[in-house]
Amino acid sequence: MQALNPHLAPTPCIDSAHPAVMAFARTHAQGATERDRAVALYNAVRDGLRYDPYRIDLSEHGMKASTALAQGLGWCVPKAVVLTAVARAAGIPARLGFADVRNHLSTQKLRETMQTDVFVWHGYTELWLDGAWRKATPAFNLS
């Protein structure tokens, strides 16, 4: 478990010790098992923060979990940062991952804005559950 300690610690952007992040984790990390709590956090981040790929702030402040929570929205990277932070606040080891992905569900407006359907630097979260890293992408709201 000592090897997982870095994946439980706060960082400048994964500000898991921030009061708002801790409160969100306490409110939403419900369930009998760690997996149940992780799924509850995933759903809360995915559906509780509106996906908005048109407001991108790459500053340190703009990339903080606490900032995305305060704004109630974010694009894939801040939403992944939030899930990583609230998981850590709930005691679930978590880390960020990035990949270039082709999004066949993107809107015409987004494809025109990006001039492609490839999402470069798509952010996701990896959660340590049941002895392995599990990928979770909370970007796109269920609705």
Model regions and ranges:
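Secondary-structure capping and boundary motifs in well-ordered enzyme cores
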Residues: 68, 72-75, 117
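Hydrophobic/aromatic-rich core segments of domains that either
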Residues: 43, 78-143
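Secondary-structure boundary elements
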Residues: 1-71
